[in-house]
Amino acid sequence: MGDQPFIPPPQQTALTVNDHDEVTVWNAAPCPILPRDQVYVRVEAVAINPSDTKMRGQFATPWAFLGTDYAGTVVAVGSDVTHIQVGDRVYGAQNEMCPRTPDQGAFSQYTVTRGRVWAKIPKGLSFEQAAALPAGISTAGLAMKLLGLPLPSPSADQPPAHSKPVYVLVYGGSTATATVTMQMLRLSGYIPIATCSPHNFDLAKSRGAEEVFDYRAPNLAQTIRTYTKNNLRYSLDCITNVESTTFCFAAIGRAGGHYVSLNPFPEHAATRKMVTTDWTLGPTIFGEGSTWPAPYGRPGSEEERQFGEDLWRIAGQLVEDGRLAHHPLRVVQGGFDQIKQGMELVRKGELSGEKLVVRLEGP
């Protein structure tokens, strides 16, 4: 019986947004079709990201599936796939709410992998731990690309050496994206410094920050300019509001530099011509572009698709080697109602220094 091929059920359960713009558990959702170059996954755990909570209104495709981060068990393998077998464990990201593939989202009982934005879960890593990584890996890689910084080399024993310290300011250093980015920066030979609340200082330092500052401290921009000898050139804003943008611009050294945020930033706060600006857009990691409303809409790009493939090949190796750690977890057991409740916790900002993961119970 174990040798019989997997046949998807006629229906599955998924989390979606209905015609009334309400997040709803859909018990009669369709199952996706398996492409030849992908694998079919029974979802075992999912992580909830702030972006998941924003898929409403113009960002929602009614009855498309929600969810980016998943980890699960391979139940079927496409005919062109040779390196994965049924029973293997994988983790990856989905392009949620995509109108071209409405039945592919992480918040479902079954999904199929997408592009090359997935990897095999190494031994010793649980489904819950693996599910916490995909969005962080993808966003960290995109941020480094936009800052003009190279990705780590998975084969290097030591990070590359620079003639003098090259600092990167990470504003919001206790966020899930920040903790992955700081590790990757360290592995690329850069020195992260971070801002966050004092109760998360140890977390930021454990993920690579050389120094951590209380974001509420007076005259902090000047403190950082002094710490970096007025030579700070790179700033990643993981919060993205008027205060964070203004602060990052003030902390960058006299010669200017590069500012990247995780969302469109308030342009009136970007006050220095010597500082270049950009912001990350998650779906670009697939090379598929985005159909979201302006300013998020973007055409597909083969260059971005190739970058996503390269990033995930590197990051997958780093995770396997134990050199890239996940964010601290808050794990809850349950089903799709628990995912829905978790989205509300994340939307309200009720977590600090933790990634919310739901371990899905069996049918």
Swiss-Prot record:
<feature type="binding site">
    <location>
        <position position="280"/>
    </location>
    <ligand>
        <name>NADP(+)</name>
    </ligand>
</feature>
<protein>
    <recommendedName>
        <fullName>Lovastatin nonaketide synthase, enoyl reductase component lovC</fullName>
        <ecNumber>2.3.1.161</ecNumber>
    </recommendedName>
</protein>
<keyword id="KW-0547">Nucleotide-binding</keyword>
<feature type="binding site">
    <location>
        <begin position="174"/>
        <end position="177"/>
    </location>
    <ligand>
        <name>NADP(+)</name>
    </ligand>
</feature>
<comment type="similarity">
    <text>Belongs to the zinc-containing alcohol dehydrogenase family.</text>
</comment>
<dbReference type="InterPro" id="IPR013154">
    <property type="entry name" value="ADH-like_N"/>
</dbReference>
<dbReference type="GO" id="GO:0050637">
    <property type="term" value="F:lovastatin nonaketide synthase activity"/>
</dbReference>
<comment type="pathway">
    <text>Polyketide biosynthesis; lovastatin biosynthesis.</text>
</comment>
<dbReference type="InterPro" id="IPR047122">
    <property type="entry name" value="Trans-enoyl_RdTase-like"/>
</dbReference>
<feature type="binding site">
    <location>
        <begin position="262"/>
        <end position="263"/>
    </location>
    <ligand>
        <name>NADP(+)</name>
    </ligand>
</feature>
<feature type="binding site">
    <location>
        <position position="215"/>
    </location>
    <ligand>
        <name>NADP(+)</name>
    </ligand>
</feature>
<dbReference type="InterPro" id="IPR036291">
    <property type="entry name" value="NAD(P)-bd_dom_sf"/>
</dbReference>
<dbReference type="GO" id="GO:0140735">
    <property type="term" value="P:lovastatin biosynthetic process"/>
</dbReference>
<dbReference type="Pfam" id="PF08240">
    <property type="entry name" value="ADH_N"/>
</dbReference>
<dbReference type="InterPro" id="IPR011032">
    <property type="entry name" value="GroES-like_sf"/>
</dbReference>
<dbReference type="InterPro" id="IPR020843">
    <property type="entry name" value="PKS_ER"/>
</dbReference>
<feature type="binding site">
    <location>
        <begin position="351"/>
        <end position="352"/>
    </location>
    <ligand>
        <name>NADP(+)</name>
    </ligand>
</feature>
<dbReference type="GO" id="GO:0000166">
    <property type="term" value="F:nucleotide binding"/>
</dbReference>
<feature type="binding site">
    <location>
        <begin position="51"/>
        <end position="54"/>
    </location>
    <ligand>
        <name>NADP(+)</name>
    </ligand>
</feature>
<keyword id="KW-0560">Oxidoreductase</keyword>
<dbReference type="GO" id="GO:0016651">
    <property type="term" value="F:oxidoreductase activity, acting on NAD(P)H"/>
</dbReference>
<feature type="binding site">
    <location>
        <begin position="197"/>
        <end position="200"/>
    </location>
    <ligand>
        <name>NADP(+)</name>
    </ligand>
</feature>
<keyword id="KW-0808">Transferase</keyword>
<feature type="region of interest" description="LovB-binding">
    <location>
        <begin position="226"/>
        <end position="272"/>
    </location>
</feature>
<comment type="function">
    <text>Trans-enoyl reductase; part of the gene cluster that mediates the biosynthesis of lovastatin (also known as mevinolin, mevacor or monacolin K), a hypolipidemic inhibitor of (3S)-hydroxymethylglutaryl-coenzyme A (HMG-CoA) reductase (HMGR). The first step in the biosynthesis of lovastatin is the production of dihydromonacolin L acid by the lovastatin nonaketide synthase lovB and the trans-acting enoyl reductase lovC (called the lovB-lovC megasynthase complex) via condensation of one acetyl-CoA unit and 8 malonyl-CoA units. Dihydromonacolin L acid is released from lovB by the thioesterase lovG.</text>
</comment>
<keyword id="KW-0521">NADP</keyword>
<comment type="subunit">
    <text>Each MAT domain from the lovB homodimer binds one lovC molecule to form the final active lovB-lovC megasynthase complex.</text>
</comment>
